[in-house]
């Protein structure tokens, strides 16, 4: 609430007055309806949303998996969580450095592929026990780190053709992404069985689903 107040009071509008829009609810819903039928937009928005959903499953499920199942002390859990946050920042910085040399579409394909592979690898090591706790930590680190590449790339690709309605497109994309995160949390609670499998299953589904939905919808 404080941040919203500061933005409202002190962050100036940079868009020239002649380019500003004052759409009512009907116009906004009409724009959203059009965007929901746009395969290019939805392919990128849903891909990003699914990958983010996997991150929400990690956030909700990892305290139980780390501390209850693998004996990580509460004071040490923050180290693992912080390491993943650093991974996100590093992936974001690497993406920014490569954007002038590698096509964004290719980078996004690579990031989504890594997300899918790491999510499926997490499921495999969870089901088999191969590599133990270290393998779970490593695969989660790779998956979560890719958020730093997937989020900016899906947003840029989704909104590139919609500059005239960038605000509405951004709002819809945010709604879809955080809606996917909420659904991932609900699914985790519904599937919880006292093991690490529900978290791994949702992360794997979200990673593979993000890769698949972009491949199917973006032509």
What are these regions (language model features)?
Residues 1-19, 213-214:
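C-terminal membrane-cytosol helix-exit motif in multi-pass small-molecule transporters
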Residues 12-45:
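Juxtamembrane intracellular "pre-TM" segments in multi-pass secondary transporters
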Residues 37-57, 141-145:
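Pair of pore-lining "gating" transmembrane helices in MFS-fold secondary transporters
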């Amino acid at each position: 609430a404080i941040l919203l107040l500061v933005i409202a009071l002190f962050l100036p509008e940079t868009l020239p007055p002649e380019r500003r829009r004052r759409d009512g609810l009907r116009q906004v819903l009409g724009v959203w309806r059009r965007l929901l039928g746009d395969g290019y937009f939805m392919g990128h928005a849903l891909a990003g949303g699914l990958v983010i959903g996997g991150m929400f499953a990690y956030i909700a499920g990892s305290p139980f998996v780390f501390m209850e199942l693998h004996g990580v002390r509460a004071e040490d859990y923050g180290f693992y969580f912080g390491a993943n946050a650093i991974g996100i920042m590093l992936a974001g910085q690497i993406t920014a450095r490569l954007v002038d040399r590698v096509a964004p579409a290719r980078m996004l394909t690579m990031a989504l592929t890594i997300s899918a592979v790491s999510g499926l690898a997490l499921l495999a090591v969870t089901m088999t026990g191969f590599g133990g706790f270290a393998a779970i930590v490593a695969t989660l680190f790779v998956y979560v780190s890719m958020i730093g590449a997937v989020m900016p790339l899906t947003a840029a690709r989704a909104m590139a053709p919609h500059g005239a309605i960038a605000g509405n497109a951004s709002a819809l994309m945010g709604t879809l992404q955080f809606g996917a995160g909420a659904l991932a949390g609900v699914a985790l609670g519904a599937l919880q069985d006292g093991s690490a499998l529900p978290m791994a299953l949702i992360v794997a589904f979200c990673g593979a689903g993000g890769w698949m939905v972009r491949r199917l919808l973006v032509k």
